[in-house]
A protein has these predicted regions:
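N-terminal pre-P-loop "Q-motif" helix
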Residues: 382-390, 396-397
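Extended, folded cores of ATP/NTP-driven motor/assembly subunits in large transport
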Residues: 2-372, 378, 393, 400-401
């Protein structure tokens, strides 16, 4: 009986039970969230930009700032079962062609399209006829990996203003090497807007660095050293404060700068689909290598994680599921990774817009909608601008003049 009570009141036993229950709860949450996402009506938009596009990465940053408007306030979240919508910005090489996509819940389609057009007026947007991620025919090898941050998310990665050459060129250059093969590479950058509360975590990190405390990931060895230090008498004055090094001063400055912009929770997924496992590993290694161009010795950077050959995990790509918190990037960092190509990107095989489009002339008699009717206009043609059909023709009163 004594042994039973000793086990019953052992804190390690209860800690283990709590940990197991927490894990099971988390797994259940994942399943519920996954079902919610998979049951959401979504749309995949293909974006084509003219090769003469002169909009820089700054346009993408402004786009992300406006798209941040999908952020729900606490009341809206409560009414929406706590679900905050996210977007997926994608670059894909299929059949040797490099395409740019944006995925979203269908309820956001009109808003997202409008924001894209506002920053890229010459872009052509089409609803994809089929989702590339659903076509796995004859793909025997599927190699998947994720991109994660090396350091604390308070520290920024290298951004586009620090590059002499557009960083997108390095990414698309790797995809272009698939030319002439049936292999595929998918890049999905999932982004969910977050409230400015994340700045508080950044401020806490800055305070720890300024005070000389450890501000990064803590492991068990570090905890043991802390416990050991508690039993060790102090050698100096309790009020002695260590001055931050020049390196820490730079990191503090950059972290504070990062926190001045809007933020997104981000998850980056990479997939290679082909026939040969060795080739798959080499291609993913090359692709993850291009993300290291955003690495900085004193600041933050990217590394590969969660690599897998498990085909079942491709479902996460197909559903664009985003169930955890990912890591935080601000709009400048996110725009450095994903933006529409411009004149400085000379990568072959990018699918550019074949022709420019413009809205109908202001004096042209038009009827908006392909089935609409206007008794004052004799319609004889149909045009499409930004996904909206317009009938055009001649005013009936002018017919007698011709």
């Amino acid at each position: 009986m004594t042994a039973f009570f000793s086990i019953l009141f052992n804190p390690l036993v209860w800690l283990t039970i709590v940990a197991i229950l927490a894990f099971l709860t988390w797994q259940n949450y994942k399943k519920i969230d996954k079902l919610t996402v998979m049951n959401t009506d979504s749309v995949l938009l293909a974006l084509e930009i003219p090769k003469t596009n002169d909009k820089s990465e700054l346009a993408a940053e402004q786009l992300l700032a406006s798209l941040h408007g999908i952020l729900r306030d606490p009341t809206e979240l409560k009414n929406n079962n706590g679900v905050q919508e996210h977007l997926s910005f994608e670059i894909v090489s299929v059949n040797g062609a490099i395409r740019f996509y944006v995925w979203m819940p269908r309820t956001l389609q009109s808003f997202v399209e409008g924001q894209i057009y506002s920053q890229y007026p010459t872009v052509q947007i089409y609803e994809a006829k089929e989702d590339y991620a659903e076509n796995l025919e004859n793909k025997h090898v599927v190699y998947l990996t994720e991109i994660d941050l090396i350091e604390n998310e308070a520290l920024p990665i290298k951004t586009f203003d620090g590059f002499e050459v557009d960083p997108l060129a390095g990414i698309t250059g790797t995809l272009a090497k698939l030319d002439g093969t049936n292999d595929q590479i998918w890049i999905q950058v999932l982004a969910r807007p977050v409230a400015d509360d994340w700045h508080k975590k950044s401020d806490e990190w800055v305070k720890k660095v300024k005070s000389g405390k450890k501000a990064f990931k803590i492991d068990w060895k570090y905890i043991l050293r802390i416990l050991e230090a508690l039993w060790t008498p102090p050698e100096g004055s309790e009020n002695a404060k260590k001055e931050p090094s020049d390196r820490d001063k730079t990191r503090i400055s950059k972290a504070e700068e990062k926190a001045t912009k809007l933020g997104y929770q981000v998850k980056i997924r990479l997939a290679y689909l082909g026939e040969d496992e060795d080739t798959a590993r080499l291609q993913i290694q090359a692709l993850t290598g291009t993300f290291k161009q955003f690495n900085s010795t004193n600041l933050n950077g990217f590394k590969a994680s969660n690599s897998s050959l498990d085909k079942d995990k491709i479902r996460d790509f197909q559903s664009r599921i985003f169930f955890d918190d990912g890591f935080i990037l601000n709009i400048q960092e996110l725009a450095s990774i994903w933006h529409l190509p411009h004149t400085n990107v000379e990568t072959p095989n990018i699918v550019w817009a074949s022709s420019k489009t413009a809205e109908p002339p202001s004096k042209l008699p038009i009827i908006t909608g392909d089935r609409a009717h206007d008794e004052n206009i004799s319609a004889f043609g149909l045009t499409n601008f930004r996904g909206i059909n317009h009938q055009f023709g001649m005013l009936r009163r002018d017919r007698s003049r011709h």
